[in-house]
Amino acid sequence: DKVIKDTCDNFKYNGLDNLKPNKSYLFISNHRDITLDPAFLNLALHKNNFSTVNIAVGSNLMDQKWAADLMRLNKSFIIPRTGISKREIYKSLNNVSEFIYEKLKIDNESIWIAQREGRAKDGMDITDPAILKMIHLVKRKEISVSAFFNQMRVIPISISYEFDPNDLNKALEIYKKKKDGFYKKENREDLESISRGISGFKGSVVLNIGKQINFIHDSYEAAADEITKQISNQFYNHSTNIDAKSIINNKINLSDNNYFSERLKNQPEEVIEIMLNQYANSVL
């Protein structure tokens, strides 16, 4: 609540009537902010007497002890991003799959997981079939893709921020990657992103909770496409999203939007274009 009071104009959420308090769900969400995306969902659930979720986080966030402690306090579990060997990574992912299955089906607890590895720094909310493949690992020989995910009760989540405190950093990262062919993260970069995301001004934040998805096709790609479609359809576009699209389409000038003109002052043309696209890509 303090984060909302200090750094948001408002926080709105819709779709809790799609959930039953005594059921567990697999919430699959678009991903814009490392810690706040699941935190906003947890806040909406908690305020309405639903149980909070177990949160999937990448192992890259565990390098610093305070971040690891914060994540564990938050009912988080680790998804390995690296390992010594392929076999070791496979074993770890199998353990994650087992954990997710047991939480949902035995403990009746819900799970939050992002639709792709890492935040959508380009504003393209596309579900990675590899995420679904990992979740299905433990039962892949017993249950078909569609039957499995129907059992998991998948709920699409869309979160949108009027202002993303990390928008320029994301744009600069994409720019450097394009320019140099690679991007080397500094040691504390993810932690600085977490801090900036929490303390930076976000304006209006909207969280939309969709209806349970009914899967009919037995392929990870088709299931991923369906999740992407649902997340995209219920995404709330703020004035920043709409203005970014209008600037790209030459309907208005950059100077017509105070936020973009201030934020992008003295930035190279390529960075301006990348950051505008980050906001505009959600506008269909």
Predicted regions and their residues:
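Active-site-proximal binding-pocket segments
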Residues: 115
